[in-house]
């Protein structure tokens, strides 16, 4: 089934409850496979960001709200001007662009640390559940 048909078939299916993000899997040795997508391990906090009617709620992978801890991320996500559910990771980058988990744990909103939200996946857009589409199309 083509992408357009999949979108039309599933356009009214909504995501109505908290979604636990997929987590990385540890392996015994490195491998390469064209059927897999490889991503950087950022060493941050996994987060699901829900943007709805110009309101943003950021959840940890366990469902804890993170808005109070990372208001700059919520403010930035509001600027998207779309309703969306985004899976990503909150990190603090050091001067070399590497994630620093210790600095993330110590993060204070006024600290000037380089706080970022790296999006991995778009789960819904403007009320449409798009999880049925292949990751590379989302």
Set out the residue ranges of the language-model regions.
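Catalytic cores of nucleic-acid ligases and guanylyltransferases
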Residues: 1-138
